[in-house]
């Protein structure tokens, strides 16, 4: 069994949001025919996507070809829209979540849903989380690595974490809103370097901000193998112990205490990196994640995990399925 915790999906179409809300900044989808569409933001091309980004039947065909049993579906992060008026973001979230729920309902043995929330308005976010879990049946939510000027340790977000604990709703943290200009303008650096940096900052903010202390039952997964965190934990812990006046302002506990307290996906593209990741984060906390259907994703799902001579069959099964089932709070028999 292979459960892919990190995949993205969009509706085939959605309303003209600029006309709907009266201001720009929104992403629109322009279908081009022949299984291709353009994501357009304020008249500029953001990304060209293929039919597998909106058509569940195409996805299932490709899943069957690659041996993937289940995909956890989440929106494309550019759709988060945390910058917008909260009620407008809520309306978009409801549209995206309803579309996602309809796809899961059609293929409940192949897909599970990770919803999206208006995180800039925590009260509305909690209400939509309740709906996602209780009405739509989602086991989790995808959130950004920061919410406008809030890092993930901001007390404004604590009601969301409290609700997630109460509802047993898992959180999948995805980097987004990287610097795109200046020194980052060339070489795809926002995706190659910016995303790992964003994820590392998100992990550090939750650790040093005491989030895992305040919400010990919170289940959190960080995308892209936790970014640079597994490689830099030595520097982070050393800095914490050398300069507690700077690093221990909100949490006196050594960052190493929290290794094993959160999950990451496996998307590191390198056997040495995957070995380090499982050594640092724990073999019980790393889950297969591919970033399907995008080019930076793992094109052969699970191939890297299966190639690891250091991993026994029990470990490989944990990484490809068992850990995801634990993270999502689901039983294997639902998908067998």
Curated annotation (Swiss-Prot):
Q: Does the keyword Lyase apply?
A: yes
Cellular component annotations (GO), alphabetically ordered: cytosol
* Pathway participation: Secondary metabolite metabolism; quinolate metabolism
What Pfam families does UniProt report for this protein, alphabetically? Answer: Amidohydro_2
EC assignment: the record states 4.1.1.45
Give tissue specificity per the record.
Highest expression in kidney with lower levels in liver and brain.
User: What are the recorded GO MF terms, alphabetically?
Assistant: aminocarboxymuconate-semialdehyde decarboxylase activity; hydrolase activity; zinc ion binding
PANTHER family per the UniProt record, alphabetical = 2-AMINO-3-CARBOXYLMUCONATE-6-SEMIALDEHYDE DECARBOXYLASE, 2-AMINO-3-CARBOXYMUCONATE-6-SEMIALDEHYDE DECARBOXYLASE
What is the recorded function of this protein according to its Swiss-Prot or TrEMBL entry?
Answer: Converts alpha-amino-beta-carboxymuconate-epsilon-semialdehyde (ACMS) to alpha-aminomuconate semialdehyde (AMS). ACMS can be converted non-enzymatically to quinolate (QA), a key precursor of NAD, and a potent endogenous excitotoxin of neuronal cells which is implicated in the pathogenesis of various neurodegenerative disorders. In the presence of ACMSD, ACMS is converted to AMS, a benign catabolite. ACMSD ultimately controls the metabolic fate of tryptophan catabolism along the kynurenine pathway.
Protein name per Swiss-Prot or TrEMBL: 2-amino-3-carboxymuconate-6-semialdehyde decarboxylase
Q: State the gene name recorded for this protein.
A: Acmsd
